[in-house]
């Protein structure tokens, strides 16, 4: 019987992590855990409730009293709920995207999120994507992938995503925002964006999503047979 693995996929904003992770999870019949959506959810909630994003204690208290649930719809789409309310679309707005790196830098927030994420992965058979999965959340994951792509390519992808959703955001603004998030994510003190020593690096700039997923699936299949 094939072993159920833990797969960690890390990388900067808009490198294609979530899209690839969903494909890999679907093909392997694994559970997909979008850690970025969890951080987005608490950022959205804080903005909705008017909590000061510079107040780590208030944000951590808000997270500890809030149930964040990730489910999969019958159509295979991930849904995000806060206390039973569907916030799947609401957490993808620019206001949340622009603030999530601020909320995610706090030790109290990351500690609570890490605990929840590790509980979700206890039995294996999971694909988890984020910034610090291979280095911090699942340091013993059997497969660790670090996705890269140029800022220009990532801004292009985000721009195309926004056009599909009907959002009107300038390409240059998106590129600048991605550079800012890269800086915040890689320079934060707690669990910064960093490639794990034993992670396999894949540059996705000139690859399609399916090509990236296929590369990862080959690695997973090889590991699962060992």
UniProtKB/Swiss-Prot annotation:
InterPro entries: Cytidylate_kin, Cytidylate_kinase_dom, P-loop_NTPase. Keywords: ATP-binding, Cytoplasm, Kinase, Nucleotide-binding, Transferase. The keyword Membrane does not apply. Its EC number is 2.7.4.25. GO terms for cellular component: cytosol. Its main location: cytoplasm. It catalyses: CMP + ATP = CDP + ADP; dCMP + ATP = dCDP + ADP. SUPFAM superfamilies: P-loop containing nucleoside triphosphate hydrolases. The keyword ATP-binding applies. It is found in: Cytoplasm. One of its GO terms (biological process) is nucleobase-containing small molecule interconversion. One of its GO terms (molecular function) is ATP binding. It comes from the Bacteria. ATP binds at residues 11-19. HAMAP family: Cytidyl_kinase_type1. NCBIfam families: cmk (TIGR00017). Belongs to the cytidylate kinase family. Type 1 subfamily. This is Cytidylate kinase. It comes from Bacillus licheniformis (strain ATCC 14580 / DSM 13 / JCM 2505 / CCUG 7422 / NBRC 12200 / NCIMB 9375 / NCTC 10341 / NRRL NRS-1264 / Gibson 46). The lineage of its organism: Bacteria, Bacillati, Bacillota, Bacilli, Bacillales.
């Amino acid at each position: 019987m094939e072993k159920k693995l833990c797969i960690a996929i890390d990388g900067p904003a808009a490198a294609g992590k979530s899209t690839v992770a969903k494909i890999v999870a679907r093909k392997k019949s694994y559970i997909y855990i979008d850690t970025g959506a969890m951080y987005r959810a608490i950022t959205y909630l804080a903005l909705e409730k008017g909590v000061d994003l510079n107040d780590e204690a208030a944000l951590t208290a808000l997270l500890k009293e809030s149930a964040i649930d990730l489910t999969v719809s019958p159509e295979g789409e991930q849904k995000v709920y806060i206390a039973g309310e569907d916030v799947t679309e609401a957490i993808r707005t620019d206001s949340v995207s622009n603030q999530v790196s601020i909320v995610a830098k706090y030790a109290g927030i990351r500690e609570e999120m890490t605990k929840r994420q590790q509980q979700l992965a206890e039995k294996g058979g999971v694909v988890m994507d984020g910034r610090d999965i291979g280095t911090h959340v699942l340091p013993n994951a059997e497969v660790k992938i670090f996705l890269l792509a140029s800022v220009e390519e990532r801004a292009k992808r985000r721009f195309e995503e926004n056009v599909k959703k009907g959002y009107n955001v300038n390409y240059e603004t998106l590129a600048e925002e991605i550079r800012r998030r890269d800086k915040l994510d890689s320079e934060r003190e707690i669990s910064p964006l960093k490639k794990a020593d034993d992670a396999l690096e894949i540059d996705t700039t000139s690859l399609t999503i399916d090509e990236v997923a296929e590369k990862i699936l080959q690695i997973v299949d090889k590991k699962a047979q060992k």
